[in-house]
UniProtKB/Swiss-Prot annotation:
This is Large ribosomal subunit protein uL16c. GO terms for molecular function: rRNA binding; structural constituent of ribosome. It comes from Angiopteris evecta. It holds the Pfam family Ribosomal_L16. GO terms for biological process: mitochondrial translation.
């Protein structure tokens, strides 16, 4: 499971997820990608489940890139504990995902295989996603320039 080796601080504020993703929203490594359409926290377990689903479907062919990393600790208090006495201990790690963020990229497989693999991974995600290709990305960039 993914988690940082060390962090500067053990606990973080929850924060807010406003707006769209300004970074990590373009295909950089592969030919096909899975893009988030809603804001959410994606846990390390969900990222790993998606990775396993894609690699199992694509078999030996293809290379997979995970474009998100769980770097935010989520704390929880023990069950049936009274209020007060500080913040709970870190339980798991999440990645803050905003709309437009690329979650996974894949190349070295056909579009049909990539689409099917990403669809299986999309079922593991807690949000709506879309399958995109480098060709589709270039078209959307050209539309913005006009």
């Amino acid at each position: 499971m993914l988690n940082p080796r060390r962090t500067r601080f053990r606990k973080q504020h929850r924060g807010r997820m406003r707006g769209i993703s300004t970074r990590g929203n373009r295909i950089c490594f592969g030919k096909f990608a899975l893009q988030a359409l809603e804001p959410t926290w994606i846990t390390a377990r969900q990222i790993e489940a998606g990775r396993r689903a894609i690699t199992r479907y694509a078999r030996r062919g293809g290379k997979l890139w995970i474009r998100i990393f769980p770097d935010k600790p989520i704390t929880m208090r023990p069950a049936e504990t009274r209020m007060g006495s500080g913040k709970g201990s870190p339980e798991y790690w999440v990645s803050v995902v905003k709309p437009g963020r690329i979650l996974y990229e894949i190349s070295g497989v056909s579009e049909n295989v990539a689409r099917a693999a990403m669809k299986i991974a999309a079922y593991k995600m807690p949000i709506r996603t879309q399958f995109i290709t480098t060709i589709k990305m270039k078209e959307s960039i050209l539309d913005r320039k006009e």
